[in-house]
């Protein structure tokens, strides 16, 4: 078993403090400026890394009005899957 790894100068082992990875998800609300502010805020809280899901609506689903593509129940009730993914997408151009 691997005893230790080092990521950007931080040792990760059985005896080190946890390496904390935060999930940004769609909390940027489509704004790259908000994404940067989220990353800065996470860093100021001691987060070691940010996990981002990079996708576009077209890579997740099709733009379809059939019932199988409409969310039923919950916060996103009656949202079309495509529209939800479009709202939450993290574009590849942000890299």
Which positions does each model-derived feature cover?
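N-terminal amphipathic alpha-helix/helix-capping segment at the start of soluble metabolic enzymes
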Residues: 1-21, 95
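Conserved, mostly hydrophobic/aromatic
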Residues: 23, 42
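Glycine-rich phosphate/pyrophosphate-binding beta-alpha loops
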Residues: 25-27
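Aromatic/hydrophobic pocket-lining residues that form the small-molecule binding cavity
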Residues: 35, 91, 95
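Glycine-rich, proline-tolerant flexible connector loops at the mouths of alpha/beta enzymes
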Residues: 48-89
């Amino acid at each position: 078993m691997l005893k230790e790894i080092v990521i950007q100068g931080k040792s990760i082992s059985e005896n080190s403090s946890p390496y904390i990875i935060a999930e940004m998800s769609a909390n940027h609300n489509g704004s790259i400026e908000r994404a940067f502010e989220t990353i800065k805020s996470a860093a100021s809280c001691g987060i070691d890394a940010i996990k981002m899901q990079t996708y576009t609506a077209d890579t997740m689903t099709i733009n379809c009005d059939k019932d199988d593509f409409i969310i039923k129940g919950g916060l996103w009730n009656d949202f079309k899957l495509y529209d939800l993914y479009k709202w939450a997408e993290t574009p590849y151009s942000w890299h």
